[in-house]
Design a protein with these regions (language model features):
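C-terminal cap of thioredoxin/glutaredoxin-like
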Residues: 1-8, 90, 95-191
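Structural alpha/beta surface segment adjacent to cysteine/selenocysteine redox centers
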Residues: 1-104
Length: 191
């Protein structure tokens, strides 16, 4: 909205999900004490925003035991999709993140399969095969970029996502988006 409607420069920076960056965060959290409430919250927010939302994702990008909180060692999906996204030209990364999130959490089965990724990249005018090749060929560079983004995220003051940073302030979560807009208005954004 801010970028497309008001010309705000959004510098999207991909980080690995918290379960990958800080698996210990989920120790002792389980379906009944944590995940159940998160799912209810996400479903309500999606409904309020008019977004498609279906749980669980098929497959879930993070392999995790929701009854114990344990993040599994084997992660067959999250690194591939993160590296694929990071291989996309920077000005299209946010668009891809938006579209693939709609697939993952909107009920698209096998969102990670090439045919679904091709559909998303085609929609955005991107070349699936060249992105896939770049993700494979430049994997170490991509991992370094993501780690740099994670370092900058922590330096901004928070480890969560979504995180917006403007000047010296961070805005964590969808609920803080309106606070970010207020700050932009103070600096002259005409909405």
């Amino acid at each position: 909205m801010l970028r497309d409607k008001y010309g705000v420069d959004v510098n999207f920076k991909l980080v690995y999900p918290l379960a990958i960056r800080e698996p210990e965060f989920f120790e002792g959290k389980n379906f009944f004490t944590y995940f159940w409430w998160k799912m209810i919250d996400m479903k309500l927010k999606a409904r309020r925003l008019g977004l498609p939302f279906s749980l669980p994702p098929k497959p879930d990008p993070i392999c995790q035991n929701t009854f114990t909180g344990e993040v599994l060692k084997d992660q067959p999906f999250i690194f591939d999709i993160c590296h694929f996204l990071q291989a996309i030209e920077h000005d299209k990364q946010l668009d891809f993140a938006y579209e693939i999130s709609r697939c993952i959490f909107g009920g698209t089965e096998d969102w990670h399969k090439d045919n679904n990724l091709i559909e998303v990249t085609n929609k955005l005018g991107l070349d699936f095969q060249s992105i896939k090749n770049k993700a494979a060929e430049k994997e170490e560079e991509i991992i370094s970029q993501i780690k740099k983004n994670q370092k900058e995220q922590l330096e901004a003051g928070h480890h969560g996502v979504p995180l917006s940073v403007y000047k010296d302030k961070f805005f964590f979560g969808q609920d803080k988006f309106n606070d970010l807009v207020k700050e932009l208005k103070k600096d002259g954004l005409n909405i």
